[in-house]
Regions:
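A generic secondary-structure micro-motif detector
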Residues: 35-36, 79, 83, 121-122
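S-adenosyl-L-methionine-dependent methyltransferase catalytic module, highlighting the catalytic core
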Residues: 5, 84-92, 96, 102-212
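Residues lining the SAM
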Residues: 77-80, 106
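Conserved N-terminal segment of class I S-adenosyl-L-methionine
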Residues: 1-69, 73-77, 90, 126, ...
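Active-site micro-motifs of SAM-dependent methyltransferase domains
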Residues: 63, 81, 111
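Generic C-terminal helix-cap and adjacent flexible tail
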Residues: 215-216
Length: 216
């Protein structure tokens, strides 16, 4: 999905480019790891990525240690919901994004879907799509795509996966939260069902949304 969005709204795949993947944890979403800088807040994730031979740095999305207009594209998938001052995070991404660059953001949406698993994985909020759209525009970015990519099925599965995992003990799981969603990565069939459900779900009923925005 990230790859297709990049191809749809940017020509960077046809030329030399660099990407920042912010908060990827141990599951990068970039289409080309060799051209990507991975920016992670957690030292554990940085160490893991470096052991895989990847270019990973410790960093905070609200205080990025890069000069302005450093990246052709920025990926920020399931990150802003963890950030208290998320507006600063958006403005920092806009600052380090090159002119005509593309930022892709995905976040959980709609407070009606809030459950205890949101709190367990460190969510500060579930976003209102309209509010987030205004915040993205306020940073100087132009939204070129707005697409629901979640569903009630995704929400139900996520809640139950976390519920089952928590039964193993909070101490163990707090040290391995990053592994909770590996289930999705290895179960191709289930992923297909999730994608189909998302494609049939309206923004009003979606659990996750994708924004793609350009810097003009």
């Amino acid at each position: 999905m990230i790859h297709k969005t990049l191809e749809k709204h940017s020509d960077i795949m046809a030329r030399e480019y660099n990407i920042a993947d912010i908060g990827s944890g141990i599951s990068p979403v970039t289409p080309d790891i060799s051209k990507t800088v991975f920016i992670e807040l957690e030292k554990q994730a940085v160490d893991f990525l470096r052991k895989q031979g990847l270019n990973a740095v410790k960093g905070d999305i609200t205080h990025l240690s890069f000069q302005k207009e450093s990246f052709d594209a920025i990926l920020c998938s399931e990150v802003l919901e963890h950030v208290p001052n998320y507006k600063k995070g958006i403005s920092e991404m806009a600052r380090v994004l090159k002119k005509n660059g593309l930022v892709i953001i995905t976040v959980p949406i709609h407070q009606k879907y809030w459950k205890d698993d949101d709190e367990f994985v460190g969510h500060c909020r579930r976003f209102d799509p309209e509010t987030l759209a205004k915040d993205i525009k306020a940073s100087g970015l132009q939204i070129v795509e707005r697409k629901p990519i979640g569903s009630r099925l995704e929400r139900w599965l996520t809640w139950n996966i976390v519920k089952i995992a928590r039964r193993k003990g909070n101490k163990e799981m707090n040290a391995n939260k990053v592994k909770l969603f590996a289930f999705y990565a290895i179960n191709t069939l289930l992923l297909q069902f999730i994608k189909i459900a998302a494609a049939l779900t309206s923004e009003e009923n979606s659990s996750i949304i994708l924004f793609a925005a350009k810097k003009n």
